[in-house]
Amino acid sequence: MKIFREVFELGNKEIILETGGMARQADGSVTVSCGNNVVLVTTVVKKSVADGTDFFPLSVHYLEKTYAAGKIPGGFLRREGRPSEEQILISRLIDRSIRPSFPDGFFNEIQIVATVLSYDGAFSPDILALIGASASLAISGAPYDDVVAGVRVGYTNGKYILNPNKQDLRDSDLDLVVSGTYDAILMVESEANSLPESVMLGGILYAHKHLKTIINSINRLAKVASKPRIEYSIYQINKFLKSQIKSQFFGEIKNTYTIALKQERNLKLNAIRKNVLEYIFSSDVDGNEYTEKEILEAFHDIEKDLVRSNILEGKPRIDGRCTETIRPINVKIGVLPGVHGSALFTRGETQALVVTTLGSDRDAQLVESLDGIEKCRYMLHYNFPPYSVGECGMVGMAPKRREIGHANLAKRATQAVFPNEEAYPYVVRVVSEILESNGSSSMATVCGSSLSMMDAGVPIAEPVAGIAMGLIKDGAKYAVLSDILGDEDHLGDMDFKVAGTRYGVTALQMDIKIKGISREILEQALEQARVGRLHILGIMNEVIKEHKEAVSDVAPQIHVMNINPAKIKDVVGRGGATVKGIVEKTGAQIDTSDSGEVKVFAKDKKSMDMAVAMIEEIVAEVEEGQVYKGKIVKLLDSGVFVNLLGSQDGYLPFSEIEQAGMKTNSLVEGQGLEVLVQNIDRGGRVKLSLVAR
């Protein structure tokens, strides 16, 4: 058993790549170590293409084992279940990073599994998994010539931080992951605190500069440990078939791509496809028998060439816009009467209905990870039903990876403006229902989420808007597109989503289908996105530009009280009897903490006010010189104890009672008396006198 090892430094941390010791029956197997973090990444490549496959079946699975952190899983079975959303997001991040590096037309199945074996809690293992995926591919024999690497970058006090740990990220204004090849950037994922475009671009370029160290190390490992290149074929469009279809139908196709409405355009294209199939099947084109799949792929290639060439030649886009024009936008808020906050955001043929719901601490999501259980106060969910694109399909199933990814992007885009718990004690759930989709539904979700939260009275720091940018590139010629359609995303070379406030960027997500893009294109895309974002924010601000001062009449009420910590036991009562009594009488939820914080959460203002008043009565402090109406709670030989407020009693001597002209032998427990607080000693003992009638 021969083991090969490569060591390099990343942000003053030593990273070790090792192969030959584990999972040797996989085509590629690499362990990546940094400190006490160890990730095993395996690659298996099928040696032939499955029948009927017309796409690249790459799958990436990132898995965290609880034993890696010295823990036993919860639940009845005490074993790991389905991957968490965070694991799915990391799987997507790796997939998006490496997918562009494979040759077009390569359809062999590849499965990559990254397993976290050891975890020290200081660094997230996601970058190690990404590096390991690239390294295991590089030695697997797959056609993976443009080796990819990825790094994370933070930004604190005006300086970029390479490979920041979790504490660094808590203090950072930026969480940026960049992956790419030696010469080009392929993928960007980031969350930021409204940073200028120049800082975002600088972070991307800073990250790319440091990718080269990792790529060199992977290449050295591959040089000594790589398996022989597998034999594979590349699927190619039949050029003669394509020319025959083009000669007969190009005029119709060209005219159809001037129809702005998607549904109308698709109906016409489907009719042309039907005619194309009939033409090819009924005529002896070149003596070959073509399958329906081959014919439709040739047809699709003609569509792709047409749309791309039109844009590069400066002609109008599919819906008649120029490269920088944004589709018509319509904004409505308060569209649903029975919810806490709602917005309907429509941009062209993309429409998102976004609803905000307010809840208490008990509604917070508990997220279990290797770091333990974390309470999530802000949830954002994205639903993409089949009717949004005019199709039939599965409804009511668990969210797909794409839905999870889009929700995460929208949440990251709005996280920077979301209030902290001290400023806003509510738990917030935002749900985006995509009612129509023709591109940029995730960015419509960003805009709708901002609007919906403001409608619900959530005090977000600034409105947030998002825009999706596209790219058409052929050699040195290129065009950057603002607010792309679904077809432009599908037929183009880039999907670059940018979200932010009027002050700067809060989130970026970029995916590339070609071999990378230049600094010049990045700069233009960011500037064009900034102009577009400000345009969208201007339209949103005409409807609502800051949060409503009060929550909806149908929204729950919440009140936070800070009392003397010593009084918490009085609010709770023996065995919880006091607080249970308040809950039963008012219907409110009451949460207490040892710090003295009391949260009252009620379905309406009346219930909340009643609960708050009862708690205030319990915790109120008696004051010297004040008169109180109390009740006798205990008779002694020399006087009586009178309950004044809550659990606070005072001592009333018989001498004071007699001085006021009242007989002491007539006193009974439960009798009401009006008393004056004479003094309170250092021990908190209260001395009373009787108020004369």
UniProtKB/Swiss-Prot annotation:
| Source organism phylogeny | Bacteria, Pseudomonadati, Pseudomonadota, Gammaproteobacteria, Thiotrichales
Query: InterPro entries in the record, alphabetically?
Result: ExoRNase_PH_dom1, ExoRNase_PH_dom2, ExoRNase_PH_dom2_sf, KH_dom, KH_dom_type_1, KH_dom_type_1_sf, NA-bd_OB-fold, PNPase
Names of the cofactor(s): Mg(2+)
Asked if the Swiss-Prot or TrEMBL record annotates the protein with the keyword Cell inner membrane, the reply is no
Q: Which Gene3D superfamilies match?
A: GHMP Kinase, N-terminal domain, K Homology domain, type 1, Nucleic acid-binding proteins
This protein's species is Francisella tularensis subsp. holarctica (strain OSU18)
Keywords assigned: Cytoplasm, Magnesium, Metal-binding, Nucleotidyltransferase, RNA-binding, Transferase
Q: Which family does it belong to?
A: Belongs to the polyribonucleotide nucleotidyltransferase family.
Q: Which reaction does it catalyse?
A: RNA(n+1) + phosphate = RNA(n) + a ribonucleoside 5'-diphosphate
Protein name in the entry: Polyribonucleotide nucleotidyltransferase
Any idea which positions bind Mg(2+)?
A: D489, D495
